Amino acid sequence: MSDTKVDRIYCPVCLAKFKFSEGWSEGSVVVCPICGERLILRKTADGWVGDRADKGTEKEIRDRIESFAEIRGYVFNDVKEDIVEGLMGKYKRFGDFYCPCRMEHVPEYQCPCKPTRGGDVERNGKCHCGLFWKKV
């Protein structure tokens, strides 16, 4: 077994770390494979961090949900635009893209929420708010 330490990148959206890939460097724009967020890489004293590339914009949430759906193989239905509108409203009111169908505004409910990232779509066919759907 190798003693080489694998660098990991901290994602401020899903609060998880993912593996640093060869060819990436400070300033690289990468997509978190866990939540789909576009991140700009930054090296800190504690390791690698991804800063949100388009924080607070409609582009940020649209890119995130599109990337997440592509990564997981999910699809959207006709309520997508209503949910994006709800996510924008949550950002304006509470400071982040919290699930518009949940009353709690905590980090684990940033879209895509932790239950969705944890397999709700696979188990139930869709996420809590109906944004992400399992392909049939």
Predicted regions: what they are:
Residues 11-14, 32-35:
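Short cysteine-rich clusters marking metal-coordination/redox-active sites
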Residues 20-31, 116-124:
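Short linker/helix segments within small regulatory modules
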Residues 24, 35, 105-107:
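Short loop/turn positions at the edges of beta-strands in beta-sheet-rich folds
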Residues 30, 38-39, 51, 118-120, ...:
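Short, low-complexity, polar/charged sequence segments that are solvent-exposed and flexible
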Residues 56-136:
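Long, distal/terminal scaffolding or interaction modules
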